[in-house]
């Protein structure tokens, strides 16, 4: 992609987060980080699945095999209708992210202990998810 196209997409994502009720720049970055992390762990899970397929050896997965855990993957919620996506992300995906690391003393766990998801507008969240997917 051309740099100006990427810049415009990033700017639109930023504006969509603001439209979702987050106005402080550090909070915009924080909320985008949560969403990008959700996308990244799904991509990592896909890499694990491919390694498992190619090697024939069982790998350690991020997500369980149950339908409920698979629903937490970016690829499985990115196309949801706005209200359903917002409810699913806030009630299930974000909680999963917060509890992902079982080591309560890690920096990751300490940081996420008091984390809150602040994009309050379902349509704004849907636009941000779509924007991140299109980058």
Residues covered by each model-derived region:
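Non-catalytic, mostly N-terminal accessory regions of nucleic-acid modification and defense proteins
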Residues: 1-135
């Amino acid at each position: 992609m051309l740099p100006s196209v990427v810049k415009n997409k990033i700017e639109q994502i930023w504006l969509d987060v603001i439209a979702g009720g987050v106005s402080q720049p550090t909070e915009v970055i924080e909320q985008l980080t949560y969403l990008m992390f959700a996308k990244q762990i799904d991509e990592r899970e896909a890499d694990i699945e491919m390694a498992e397929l190619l090697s024939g050896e069982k790998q350690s997965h991020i997500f369980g095999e149950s339908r409920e855990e698979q629903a937490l993957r970016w690829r499985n919620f990115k196309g949801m209708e706005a209200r359903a996506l917002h409810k699913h992300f806030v009630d299930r995906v974000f909680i999963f992210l917060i509890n992902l690391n079982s080591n309560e003393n890690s920096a990751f766990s300490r940081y996420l202990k008091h984390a809150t998801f602040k994009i309050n507008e379902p349509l704004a969240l849907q636009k941000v998810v779509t924007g991140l997917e299109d980058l």
